[in-house]
From Swiss-Prot:
Transaldolase is important for the balance of metabolites in the pentose-phosphate pathway. GO terms for molecular function: transaldolase activity. InterPro entries: Aldolase_TIM (IPR013785), TAL/FSA (IPR001585), Transaldolase_2 (IPR004732), Transaldolase_AS (IPR018225). The active site is at residue 140. It comes from Renibacterium salmoninarum (strain ATCC 33209 / DSM 20767 / JCM 11484 / NBRC 15589 / NCIMB 2235). Pathway: Carbohydrate degradation; pentose phosphate pathway; D-glyceraldehyde 3-phosphate and beta-D-fructose 6-phosphate from D-ribose 5-phosphate and D-xylulose 5-phosphate (non-oxidative stage): step 2/3. The gene is tal. GO terms for biological process: carbohydrate metabolic process; pentose-phosphate shunt. This is Transaldolase. Belongs to the transaldolase family. Type 2 subfamily. PANTHER family: TRANSALDOLASE.
Amino acid sequence: MTTNTSELSAAGVSIWLDDLSRERLTSGSLQKLIDEKNVVGVTTNPSIFQAAISKGTSYEQQVSELAAQGADVEAAVFQITTQDVANACDFFAGIAVASKGVDGRVSIEVDPRKAWDTQGTIEEAKRLHAAVGKDNVHIKIPATLEGLEAITETLGAGISVNVTLIFSLGRYRAVINAFLLGIEKAKANGHDLSQIHSVASFFVSRVDTEIDKRLDALNTDEAKSLKGKAGVANARLAYQVFEEVFSSERWALLAEAGALPQRPLWASTGVKDPAYPDTLYVTELVAPNVVNTMPEKTLDATADHGVVSGNTISGRYDEANGVLNALEGLGISYNEVVALLEKEGLEKFVASWKELLDHVQDALNSAATKGSES
């Protein structure tokens, strides 16, 4: 039976779920999304884990065991999150095998407090990879300037990487270069390049949220006509960069050696403004060799009424450039916006991580008290 999500998959878009919890793994809800809505991967981030662990009861037994072992909060969070990701990797093992590792992938992010620490990120990436112990795990590394070298070194060690928090075209080019350097290093180190997978997570809706605020402040007809267009335009131009770099001679040499391209991944695809169609960042960003990671609400909307009408990216680059040029013409600085979004994105993840640590610390204390009373 043809469905909206199966049509999206047929158009070249891998559907990943931007959510994970132990309850999803044990209740069958994740399996249902795999079976019915063509989900072929999962992404996580500090905010997702913070929400899952603070709201659910599925973690109480493990927290009690960790408290009995005298685990500190950092070790406890590491064990809880890597266990969830390892279990999710098992859910997707069949898809990973069938797709030769391109899909069936589960992402786990390095501690966001290390986003500005190159060596700390490299060490954490290797530790997470070893702890999860699954071939289909992606280690998420933020695309900070300090993260670029960490991306190269992690890939060079043969570890698959999801580069996250990309907002600008300039940074995206730097990320692709870090990827190419990493694959070249992996080749020199003797790794099987066909086993190294990478995606570059380009954030979409947050661009509109910030730029729309500035357009609203201008309150002109031209400003109003540009609302809700920047995020899609920015992502489409990122795909143009992808097409350009991955048809280059430099890439051809690596592809001959078995390397696989780093696919663009559309992240932050939940629509924030109710005035826009709730599938905007799905149906307007369809092209071969991309991933779209969706919150469940967006996935449900896509399955229900997301009309897939072929490739909606290629050949629309002049239109996309026109949007960004018009914004600059109104005095809205692209570079200022993307720098702010990176800063805010990292701050949100660090805040969520600290909330997660606080919650698990409280749970450990409570479990230890109960243990001493029994």
